[in-house]
């Protein structure tokens, strides 16, 4: 079995440590300019035929939230639109999940990704709505716009941010 694993795309994050047959050893890479890590997202090509592949994230115990791994389920997709949870094990500091689908290419992630392209679509959609005022607060360290919306005129203010 010849697998190709890649994370060189928006939000992608994984390091391949080694592959031995149907077992792939991986590590989560630190967040940008940070000592912390938790997020993973990668693509695997060369799958299919129903052969089982076991992915093992060897450094899960050192992640930012290791107590979140027990009971956690990784996400998988064959089209990057529909994501499903797959059975995942956490034992002795290693996060492990199996894949045996028929698709030749699949993506795996900590949670269903929300890419910058999806973010831009959301900003465009909300900015067009009646009663919504948009303003750009500035730029992030990566040069991305920091958008703000004002809705309503009540006394209470709520700030939400996620990415």
Each model region followed by its residue ranges:
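Structured catalytic-domain cores with a bias toward divalent-metal coordination
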Residues: 1-162
């Amino acid at each position: 079995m010849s697998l190709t694993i890649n994370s060189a795309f928006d939000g992608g994050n994984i390091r391949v440590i080694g592959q031995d047959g149907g077992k792939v050893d991986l590590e989560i890479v630190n967040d940008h300019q940070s000592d912390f890590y938790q997020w993973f997202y990668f693509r695997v090509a060369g799958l299919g035929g129903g052969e089982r592949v076991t992915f093992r994230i060897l450094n899960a115990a050192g992640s930012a939230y290791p107590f979140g791994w027990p009971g956690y389920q990784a996400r998988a997709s064959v089209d990057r639109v529909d994501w499903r949870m797959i059975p995942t094990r956490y034992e002795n500091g290693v996060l492990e999940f199996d894949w045996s689908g028929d698709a030749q290419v699949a993506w795996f992630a900590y949670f269903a990704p929300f890419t910058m392209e999806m973010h831009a679509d959301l900003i465009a959609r909300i900015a067009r709505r009646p009663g919504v005022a948009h303003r750009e607060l500035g730029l992030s360290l990566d040069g991305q716009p920091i958008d703000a919306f004002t809705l309503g005129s009540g006394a209470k203010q709520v700030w939400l941010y996620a990415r």
